[in-house]
């Protein structure tokens, strides 16, 4: 049976959020019994344009990946003073670095854990917040470099990944739901935002009832994503 309150199927667990920033030293053996199935939510992996990009990835061999998530924090929650929400306050777990963990989650899904990572972050805009509003990363993989830009102060919503390849660039625009190919062709994957969550739950229920081994996003991998998001190198 499914327990919607706990996100569980027959004793198997779907964690709805990532680990908190102070849990990077967590010993997972203390949290899960041996053989326990577990899956940490990663909704951007399940959106239509991401699935389309992932299908093409084996033949692309990109030299570089450029990732951006830029938006204006005061517009996140219409009718709510942005200065009062957790995002604005470091002590409440806010800051663009941890708020936008999904970018590192899908990068790890596409390319794995980088060999080396550098991260610079801080508060640079005139927003009335004490959390970081800008976080920039450079990551080195065996065959490519990745650039990641996260901010709270961009006017207009931009969320995309661009892959630079031998035949040109491929741009997956998550806001528009489109994939632009090197020849200018635009493929459309617009869909209701809830569709990604439906796909994710379909996977989880199937895994819980019939799957074996680790899930596609086990807690150990999610913990590594958290470490990368915080700018830590993962061995």
Predicted regions located by residue number:
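Beta-strand-loop-alpha-helix segment that lines the small-molecule cofactor/substrate pocket
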Residues: 1-45
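C-terminal helix-rich "cap/oligomerization" subdomain common to oxidoreductases
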Residues: 5-7, 203-235
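Predominantly a Rossmann-like dinucleotide-binding segment in NAD(P)-dependent oxidoreductases
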Residues: 47-118, 125
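A general structural signal for well-ordered alpha-helical segments in protein cores
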Residues: 49-50, 103-107, 198-205, 226-229
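A short glycine-threonine-serine/GTX helix/turn-capping micro-motif
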Residues: 91-98, 187-195
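Contiguous beta-strand/loop segments that form the cofactor/metal-binding neighborhood of enzyme cores
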Residues: 98, 104-176, 201-212
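Short, surface-exposed beta-strand-loop junctions and turns on beta-sheet-rich folds
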Residues: 153-155, 178-180, 185-187
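Active-site loop of classical SDR/Rossmann-like NAD(P)-dependent oxidoreductases
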Residues: 190-202, 217
């Amino acid at each position: 049976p499914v327990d919607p309150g706990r996100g569980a199927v027959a004793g198997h667990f779907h964690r709805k959020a990532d680990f908190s920033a102070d849990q990077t030293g967590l010993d997972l053996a203390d949290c899960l019994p041996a053989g326990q199935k577990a899956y940490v939510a990663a909704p951007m992996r399940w959106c239509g344009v991401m699935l389309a990009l992932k299908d093409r990835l084996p033949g692309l061999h990109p030299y570089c990946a450029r990732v951006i998530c830029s938006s204006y924090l005061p517009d996140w929650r219409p009718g709510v003073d942005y200065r009062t929400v957790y995002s604005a306050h470091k002590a409440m777990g806010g800051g663009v670095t941890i708020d936008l963990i999904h970018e590192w989650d899908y990068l790890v899904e596409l390319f794995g854990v980088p060999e080396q990572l550098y991260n610079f972050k801080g508060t640079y805009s005139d927003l009335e917040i004490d959390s970081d509003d800008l976080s920039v990363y450079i990551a080195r993989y065996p065959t490519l470099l990745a650039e990641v830009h996260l901010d709270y102060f961009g006017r207009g919503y931009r969320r995309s990944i661009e892959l630079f390849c031998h035949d040109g660039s491929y741009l997956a625009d998550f806001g528009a739901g489109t994939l632009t190919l090197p020849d200018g062709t635009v493929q459309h994957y617009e869909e209701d935002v809830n569709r990604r969550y439906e796909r994710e739950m379909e996977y989880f229920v199937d895994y819980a009832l019939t799957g074996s081994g680790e899930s596609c996003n086990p807690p150990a991998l999610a913990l590594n994503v958290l470490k990368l998001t915080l700018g830590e190198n993962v061995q």
